[in-house]
From Swiss-Prot:
Key word Signal present: no
Lineage, uppermost ranks: Eukaryota, Fungi, Dikarya, Ascomycota, Pezizomycotina
EC id: 1.-.-.-
Source organism, top-level taxon: Eukaryota
Organism: Penicillium roqueforti (strain FM164)
Name of the molecule in the record: Cytochrome P450 monooxygenase ORF9
């Protein structure tokens, strides 16, 4: 308290205590000490301190955040493995592996042993729903139960019943390519059109009706919403690792929640429409609907399953198709050999079917090579260690682990000339390539449920596409992988292709 020094005036005023000025410095000093202490702990006292990696990766989350947000994390991890070896510390509590054996250790069946569970990353698949689903369920036993009743939709019998529905959409796709991207045009962006056909197929299979992207000639807004917000999912995946994640989550909630709620409500609406459609068509939902009606499965769970099928199933197929078309057109001798095999096997377009296409050895080699050189899940499938040994190293419980799919499939010790698109490596019995290094669908009890359905799509589309047209890449300077980014899934460049009909016929859409 101080008395006024001005004559004639006498009043008392409060002077702020000295501590108010000091407080910001105290807080700053405490924060600095905390972060210095955290860095010291991560570098020398953390359970993973013995594992090599870039200094910034071992000490903080900054290296991981920078590389994932740039979209080149797959290349950064590959470079890290080249420098530091088969085990790389990507973040203070995260390890990447680059060995064949790590596939089985992390993802394979472990009789009588603890199974590495999915990490928190997979929570995004159930976000916005009041139920877990095949994508977000992290409990191994509950996941097994979900997979068992969903698997009926992906059996050999079910695939044969579903093929006419898929073929109908594929035929419309093939027709539009020729009509809108024919010899007298500037071509079409196959990155966009493969996403559209994959989305239309999943609309038929999950909701009983196409999204009509192919008919309208433009992507559905739901598809665009999913793709445009993959970057925000990458941001959220990084933020969940921070000690103040909940505060940041509340700050970002208006942005992320609006998108999430729009997505989940649209899924609910589409499932409601499918539930009222009592036709006898066989699709992904037909078996689930009977279980919902009998009370075995909750309707919200069914909705969350449908959402996962759309997100995971559509983009992975589209990614493979666009990438494989690019590599085919950049490797003329491969493209020529594949066209000849397909056209020699099928006398007419109408005679093409998935079962026969899957018997074509060179086509299967092309598919395997496409999945190797540009794996849809290139960043890896993150798991949490229960406390186990991988490649002779004990990995403490709670460590986030994965096999770097990109690194193992682009390692010269695994595949000769790994950047070369060479389907013959899958046909040559004398090849020294370690083919089990490529696991695009993962493996073990949580391997991709839709693997066989995806292969049916790929065989049908590639066979019909290469039978009907000679394709022309309009931009020969395009560096497909170099211009791609990874934000959970691939963010791909435009791929402009022109289609020259080989027989001049017009298909009925």
């Amino acid at each position: 308290m101080t008395i006024s020094p001005i004559p004639g005036l006498l009043f008392v005023y409060d002077q702020p205590p000295h501590s108010i000025y000091v407080l910001p410095f105290v807080i700053s000093a405490a924060a600095l000490c905390y972060f210095i202490g955290l860095i010291v702990f991560n570098l020398w006292f953390h359970p993973l301190a013995r594992f090599p990696g870039p200094l910034l990766a071992r000490s903080t989350l900054l290296w991981r955040m920078r590389m994932t947000l740039k979209g080149r994390i797959h290349r950064s991890i590959e470079a890290g493995h080249q420098k530091y070896g088969p085990v790389l510390r990507v973040a203070p509590n995260e390890l990447s592996f680059a060995s064949v054996s790590s596939w089985k250790s992390i993802y394979g069946h472990r009789p009588g042993g603890m199974i590495p569970t999915k990490s928190e990353f997979y929570d995004m698949y159930g976000s916005g729903f009041n139920s877990l689903c095949i994508g977000s369920e992290r409990d191994p036993e509950k996941h097994r139960q979900m997979k068992s009743f969903l698997s009926a939709a992906f059996s050999t019998k079910a695939l044969l019943e579903q093929e006419p529905l898929v073929s109908q959409t594929v035929d419309a796709f093939i027709t539009r390519l020729g009509n809108d991207g024919g010899s007298e045009t500037k071509g079409l962006d196959m990155t966009k059109w493969t996403e559209m056909v994959a989305f239309d197929i999943l609309g038929e299979m999950a909701f009983g009706q196409s999204f009509e992207c192919i008919i309208r000639g433009e992507p559905h807004y739901w598809q665009e919403m999913i793709l445009k917000h993959l970057y925000f999912i990458t941001v959220a995946d990084n933020l969940r690792r921070l000690p103040f994640a909940l505060t940041l989550a509340r700050f970002l909630a208006p942005v992320l929640t609006a998108v999430r709620n729009k997505h989940s409500q649209f899924t609910r609406d589409k499932v409601a429409e499918r539930m009222t459609n009592k036709n006898l068509r066989k699709d992904f939902m037909s078996n689930l609907i009977s279980k919902v009606e009998s009370g075995e499965v909750d309707r919200e769970e069914m909705t969350a399953h449908a959402s996962t099928l759309i997100i995971a199933g559509g983009e992975t197929v589209a990614t493979f198709l666009a990438a494989t078309v690019y590599y085919l057109l950049k490797t003329p001798e491969v493209y020529k050999a594949m066209r000849e095999e397909i056209r020699n096997r099928f006398p007419t377009y109408e005679s093409i079917n998935a079962t026969s296409a899957q018997q074509l050895p060179y086509l299967q080699a092309v598919i395997n090579e496409g999945l190797r050189i540009y794996p849809p899940g290139s960043q890896g499938f993150p798991r949490l260690s229960p406390g186990l040994a991988i490649d002779g190293e004990w990995i403490p419980e709670g460590t986030e682990i994965y096999t770097s799919a990109w690194t193992v499939t682009h390692n010269p010790q695994m595949f000769k000339d790994p950047m070369k698109f060479d389907p013959n490596r899958w046909l040559n019995e004398k090849s020294t390539d370690i083919k089990e290094s490529s696991q695009p669908f993962s493996l073990g009890p949580r391997g991709c449920l839709g693997r066989n359905f995806a292969l049916m799509e790929l065989n049908l589309i590639l066979s019909k596409l290469c039978w009907k047209y000679d394709m022309e890449l309009m931009d020969q300077s395009l560096d497909w992988e170099g211009q791609s980014k990874v934000h959970v899934m691939w963010d791909k460049p435009a791929l402009t292709v022109r289609f020259h009909s080989v027989d001049g016929s017009t298909l009925k859409a």
